[in-house]
Regions:
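An exposed tryptophan-centered "aromatic clamp" motif
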Residues: 140, 144-160, 164-220
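Short, compositionally biased
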Residues: 2-157, 220-235
Length: 235
């Protein structure tokens, strides 16, 4: 993690996972006043020094041919398959729609109906710490493990359930992600619970409440929405 990412993480934890308060604290610490930013002038015009390229971190549209474009509201809408988020070396890409059972029309699913098949190796992946959960980006690996142990969520090929760390990336850019989903004719995230693939025990896993950015454990047999991620193979 970069120093700025570490600062964001600390502020998020100190503000009890309240994204709005954490963002306000971050902006206060970093500073956003024009006089705080060194300005270099020359024949090329003004350039604000030490300002990161805004195209590195943020929200992108991913297309069916594999390329991604920085989302600016002027992109072409055809063939968009997902909304990608990049923050330093971290990145994820969510699909345009929640998982839906084509036969029953259900949009809420249990993560796992029983835990009888958990091995000691499976249990080593359980995460109970908020900080560790935020740093968990192994959604694809966790999903493969859940499927092996009986998860019945009807994911499409090359889809997986996002880890808690991947959800954090989405929530950090939530408003822009919602804007991109609407722009690309996708399904905006609902004010509801969504599963992550990060497990906390044999009987529970982490989830997010999109309406106010809260995260917590939930019993795996509870029926909850799923917004899948797209794996690299989907590109």
């Amino acid at each position: 993690m970069t120093e700025k990412q570490k600062l964001r993480m600390v502020l998020l934890l100190q503000n009890e996972c309240n994204l709005a308060k954490a963002k306000e604290a971050y902006e206060f610490v970093i500073g956003s006043d024009a006089e705080d930013v060194p300005v270099a002038t020359g024949t090329g015009g003004e350039h604000k020094c030490n300002v990161p390229d805004p195209r590195k971190d943020g929200v992108y549209l991913r297309y069916s041919d594999g390329h991604e474009e920085w989302f600016d509201g002027k992109n072409k809408k055809e063939n968009v398959i997902g909304i990608a988020v990049h923050l330093g070396e971290r990145h994820t890409c969510i699909a345009k729609f929640d998982v839906e059972d084509d036969d029953e029309g259900d949009k809420e699913f249990p993560l796992q109906e029983n835990n009888n098949s958990d091995t000691e190796e499976d249990k080593k992946a359980f995460i109970t710490s908020y900080f560790d959960a935020y740093n968990d980006l192994d959604g694809k690996k966790h999903t493969e493990s859940l499927m092996r142990r009986g998860c019945k969520i009807p994911l499409a090929e090359n889809q997986y359930i996002p880890s808690q760390g991947e959800w954090l990336l989405v929530l950090m850019f939530f408003k822009k992600v919602q804007e991109a989903l609407e722009y690309a004719c996708g399904e905006m995230l609902k004010d509801d619970w969504y599963w992550s693939s990060t497990e906390s025990s044999s009987s529970s896993a982490w989830g997010v409440v999109v309406s106010y950015g809260s995260i917590s454990y939930s019993i795996k047999t509870n029926t909850v929405r799923v917004r899948p991620c797209l794996s690299c193979e989907a590109i």
